[in-house]
Swiss-Prot record:
GO terms for biological process: 2-oxoglutarate metabolic process; NADP metabolic process. The lineage of its organism: Bacteria, Pseudomonadati, Pseudomonadota, Gammaproteobacteria, Oceanospirillales. FAD binds at E35, A36, S37, S38, Q39, V40, G41, G42, S43, C44. It comes from Marinomonas sp. (strain MWYL1). Gene3D superfamilies: 3.30.390.30, FAD/NAD(P)-binding domain. Binds 1 FAD per subunit. It is found in: Cytoplasm. One of its GO terms (molecular function) is NAD(P)+ transhydrogenase (Si-specific) activity. This is Soluble pyridine nucleotide transhydrogenase. It catalyses: NAD(+) + NADPH = NADH + NADP(+).
Length: 464
């Protein structure tokens, strides 16, 4: 068996693995990555972030066509099958894989396609798909194997009418009705997508409200627009069992209700991909969700083994995962840029989309911070009136005495882009983080960015 020597070996080529590998390679280290799939990119590129967002964009264009009065004058509404809409996502995946493969080649990072397993803390055996088993010895190892959907044992996921968030992208038809169990980020995003395709959707939420980590006003807006689009939301509901037939599924609820639909999408939680890694051989333990614990340098209990991305749990965002991997690589060799990633913007790609950074009103109230609120409704901005994307708002939370920005919350078209302006000002040191930036800055007109000036004026007028 061939043994190859590296400074760093990274398990996984998703955002966290890519961030760690690229950072280590640019620091002059010899790096290898191990990918369990046949292509680089991880679940983010093939099963999660990229295909679902490409799918969402296609559905959003269909909705725009079917609701724009100008198009209604020249033809009837058009509806597309789920597989046809999915073709667009597949084209994006191919481009992403090609680009990322080039990045690894350009940085002279060796790629091993196969499954890696620890022999000891410095040795990993890779059962490659082409050349058979090989041994990789490394001074440092990064576990960035990501996560997978949680699949309870009492649901038959092999049934053709039952899907998880990984398998839903293989759906070969457009169901007339769909039960989505789990109203987290993934559940809400897919509820928007299928609702936009004309599917009758029931969204089952085991909690008492949607996305409770968001600001209450944003959550209320999301709930309203999902219902306005035809989604039936059921809060505080859990299931007892799922009955399957050739024509659909029946979900028996703990409350006694019975729900019937053509298909079921179960997306209630995720588990870390840590099984079959041989972690027992290095005495590395995982929690009940298969996730690894790390310190503020992304180091695990084993000195030379680090972890990043979904496999360590919160915040389970592709954007944060890349930075976590980069920080882990920096910490390995004492390089700058190894700060623990804590303040990250949240992007939720419902229709309309949501993004936020910083504190919510509930958090500031609990902390007894004297804050004030500034709002700008998109319907009052010229750009939104021009584009027809008038649904939504920008909300700024700031300290009423120092005018320091404390939170930015956005709901509506381009929310995940708009939030970064506020994030940039919030990251400024000292008195440079101030609401006055928006009051004194000239914004292009007409733009969505000018909502910051409108919201700042709205909030500043409340200060006395």
């Amino acid at each position: 068996m061939t043994t190859r020597h590296y400074d760093v070996v990274v398990l996984g080529t998703g955002p966290a693995g890519e961030g760690a590998a690229m950072s280590a390679a640019k620091a002059g280290k010899r790096v290898a990555v191990i990918e369990a799939s046949s292509q680089v990119g991880g679940s983010c590129t093939h099963l999660g972030t990229i295909p679902s967002k490409a799918l969402r964009h296609a559905v959003k264009e269909i909705i725009a066509f079917n609701t724009n009065p100008m198009f209604r004058d020249i033809g009837e509404p058009r509806w597309f099958s789920f597989p046809k809409v999915l073709d667009r996502a597949n084209r994006v995946i191919d481009k992403q894989v090609m680009g990322r493969t080039e990045y690894y080649a350009r940085n002279r990072i060796d790629i091993y396609f196969g499954r890696g397993k620890f022999k000891d803390a410095n040795t990993i055996e890779v059962n490659t798909y082409e050349k058979g088993p090989e041994l990789l010895e490394a001074k440092k190892v990064v576990i960035a194997t990501g996560s997978r959907p949680y699949r309870p044992a009492n649901i038959d996921f092999s049934h053709p009418r039952i899907y998880c968030s990984d398998t839903i992208l293989s759906l070969s038809h457009t169901p007339r009705s769909l039960i989505i169990y789990g109203a987290g980020v993934i559940g809400c995003e897919y509820a928007s997508i299928f609702c936009g395709l004309g599917v009758r959707v029931e969204l089952i939420n085991p909690a008492k409200k949607l996305l409770s980590f968001l600001d209450d006003e944003i959550t209320d807006a999301l709930s309203y627009h999902l219902r306005d689009g035809g989604v039936l939301i059921r809060h505080n509901e859990t299931y007892d069992s799922v009955e399957t037939t050739e024509r659909g599924v029946v979900m028996h609820m703990a409350s006694g209700k019975k729900l019937r639909a053509d298909a079921l999408l179960f997306c209630n939680g995720r588990s870390g991909n840590t099984d079959n890694l041989g972690l027992e051989s290095i005495n590395l333990e995982v929690n009940s969700r298969g996730q690894l614990a790390v310190n503020d340098t992304y180091q695990t209990q084993v000195e030379n083994v680090y972890a990043a991305g979904d496999v360590i749990g919160w915040p389970s965002l592709a954007s944060a995962a890349y930075d976590q991997g980069r920080a882990a690589a920096a910490n390995m060799f004492g390089a700058p840029g190894g700060e623990f990633i804590s303040e990250v913007p949240t992007g939720i790609y419902t229709i309309p989309e949501i993004s936020s950074v910083g504190k919510t009103e509930a958090e500031l109230t609990a902390e007894k911070v004297p804050y004030e609120v500034g709002r700008a409704f998109f319907k009052n901005t010229a750009r939104a009136q021009i584009t027809g994307e008038a649904v939504g708002m920008l909300k700024i939370l700031f300290h009423r005495e120092s005018l320091e920005l404390l939170g930015i919350h956005c709901f509506g078209d381009q929310a995940s882009e708009i939030v970064h302006i506020g994030q940039a000002i919030m990251k400024q040191p000292g008195k440079q983080n101030t609401l006055k930036y928006f009051l004194n800055t000239t914004f292009n007109y007409p733009t969505m960015a000018e909502a910051y000036r409108v919201a700042a004026l709205n909030g500043f007028n409340r200060v006395f």
